[in-house]
From Swiss-Prot:
Protein's name according to its UniProt entry: Putative folylpolyglutamate synthase
GO terms under biological process: one-carbon metabolic process; tetrahydrofolylpolyglutamate biosynthetic process
Cofactor note: A monovalent cation.
GO cellular component, one term: cytosol
Subcellular localization(s) per the UniProt record: Mitochondrion inner membrane; Mitochondrion matrix; Cytoplasm
Entry EC no(s): 6.3.2.17
Length: 510
């Protein structure tokens, strides 16, 4: 693999605001600087609207089949070869829940050893730049805008009648940036599924992982765990080691069958108790469920290092996939890992404590409830008013998720569409055009009704306990207004877009 001396690395521009008007360039005394806001506006124009998404779900098989060939054509236009991608020493991770957290742990561990890391994830919470990180930080507005227009102009010129959709474009942009910066390892999180996901254009990753499987995106991936597992295992590549988190028998059988057909060495990650840690650890991402992701990260890191011949101090390179001695530096990296919006606590000076978690599947919501219950005790908030700020999106069913929150003693639910403000700014990072306003409003009403029906005495619930607003900022203001007379604890969950909006409004979205 390529290990670049620090002095030869390309320096990233410092983060700076590049606000401008309709023109995509802002003139400075030295040169024209591409406008970040204009790049975001054009990017948002690539989002699929609600009608298109419905069509995609109906025609999913035909459209999935052409997804990867299209990606290869775009990459060819950008002069990015399969060899260029292979040289990024990619760690490719799919799964339903925990894949982002596992990737974050991997990135933190490898970065702690001086490697230049590239991390591509989704979705973003506040700023779209969060999806493309180098050395643990989002790329600057300047770099994002410069590289955006490089990619956009080429693809617009050569594929004007067939522009890539939002996620696909960002994937191309991430590849472009990481190849240009010559990162030493790319941690690549799958978008949806795996088999037909545009990240699967990578031919030779160093190692693959499949985190916990659950029911999500069922209109695309299928209604059975075995069907979902088939898609997730689509990232397996011949002779490339792959790991999977413990799962059901039916899903495991599919993972094993796909591994055999692709000649893939496949291993189940061991429980965290199989490792010998140099000291007691508290992972930087809270929650007992994160230990499964820690185990996945440890296996991915060691397998990657073995494949690349990169020494990990205190960790013998080995093809053994059992637990191993975890040295102090690795414990530190696990604890220093940060992944906002997942099991996060935000306390304000306005008598409000927010528990935020982007859980949006049954298993993740159950884990969220267990984490929240533990934190309520730790924070000594058992006797304060508890509000649930909840919304779920796409084809997710509120009643299958919200029932897990019943033990928390919530006395009021607030729901809203995942738009930050009532009017949509198409140049804003938070703009979400994938669902119509009416659909989101209807889903918000379904959420509050599902909460009511989950209670033992739903007939006693008053209208004041069930509030629906037109946007996140209105819901946030309503919640904050109640803090004038009492202490409040708010659980924000169901959607990462919702969590990101609250972090933005609370001033924690930087």
């Amino acid at each position: 693999m390529r290990l670049l001396p620090q002095t030869n690395r390309i320096l990233l521009p410092t983060t700076s605001s590049t606000a401008c008007g309709a023109n995509q360039l802002r003139m400075s005394s030295e040169k024209a600087v591409p406008c970040y806001e204009e790049s975001v506006r054009l990017l948002n124009g690539l989002q699929s609207n609600a009608a298109t998404i419905k069509k995609l779900r109906v025609q999913r098989e035909n459209l999935q089949a052409i997804n990867l060939p299209q990606c290869r054509k775009y990459l060819e236009s950008l002069n990015i070869s399969a060899e260029d991608l292979n040289a990024l020493n990619i760690i490719h991770v799919s799964g339903t829940k925990g894949k982002g957290s596992a990737c974050a742990f991997v990135e933190s561990i490898l970065r702690s050893q001086g490697l230049r890391t590239g991390f591509y994830s989704s979705p973003h919470l506040v700023h779209v730049r969060e999806r493309i990180q180098v050395d643990g930080q989002p790329v600057s507005e300047q770099m994002f805008a410069e590289e955006f227009f490089h990619v956009y102009d080429i693809i617009k010129r050569e594929h004007s009648d067939n522009m890539p959709a939002y996620f696909k474009f960002l994937t191309l942009l991430a590849f472009r940036i990481f190849v240009k910066l010559n990162v030493q390892v790319m941690i690549l999180e799958v978008g949806i599924g795996g088999e037909y996901d545009c990240t699967n254009v990578v031919e030779k990753p160093k190692v693959c992982g499949v985190t916990t499987l659950d029911y999500d995106h069922m209109s695309i991936l299928g209604n059975k765990l075995s069907e979902i597992a088939w898609h997730k295992a689509g990232i397996f590549k011949e002779s490339v080691p792959a790991f999977y988190s413990p799962t059901t028998t039916e899903a495991e059988e599919v993972l094993i069958a796909r591994a055999i057909s692709k000649h893939v060495p496949l291993f189940q990650t061991p429980p965290v108790s199989a490792y010998q840690f140099a000291r007691d650890i508290s992972p930087g991402i809270r929650g007992a469920h994160q230990f499964s992701n820690v185990s996945m990260a440890l296996q991915l890191v060691r397998a990657w290092a073995e494949k690349c011949g990169f020494p990990l101090p205190g960790v013998p390179l080995s093809t053994d996939t059992s637990g191993f001695n975890v040295p102090l530096w690795m414990c530190d990296a696990i604890e220093s890992c940060r992944w906002p919006g997942r099991s996060q606590i935000v306390s304000t000076d306005r008598n409000v404590t927010y528990l935020l978690d982007g859980a949006h599947t049954p298993k993740s919501m159950e884990a969220c409830s267990e984490w929240a219950a533990e934190e309520i005790v730790n924070l000594k908030k058992e006797n304060v008013k508890k509000i649930l700020l909840f919304q779920c999106t796409a084809d997710r069913c509120p009643s299958t998720l919200i029932k897990y929150l019943k033990p928390l003693g919530i006395s009021q639910i607030v729901s809203c569409p995942t738009q930050l403000h009532s009017s949509i700014d198409k140049s804003a990072d938070s703009a979400n055009l994938n669902a119509s306003r009416d659909e989101q409003a209807e889903k918000a009403n379904q959420c509050v009704q599902a909460w009511k029906e989950s209670l033992d005495q739903p007939e006693s619930v008053t209208e004041d306990q069930m509030k629906v607003f037109d946007c996140i900022s209105s819901a946030y203001k309503f919640i904050e207004s109640q803090a004038a007379s009492q202490e409040i604890l708010v659980l924000v969950t169901g959607s990462l877009h919702l969590v990101g909006g609250v972090l933005n409004l609370a001033g924690k979205g930087k």
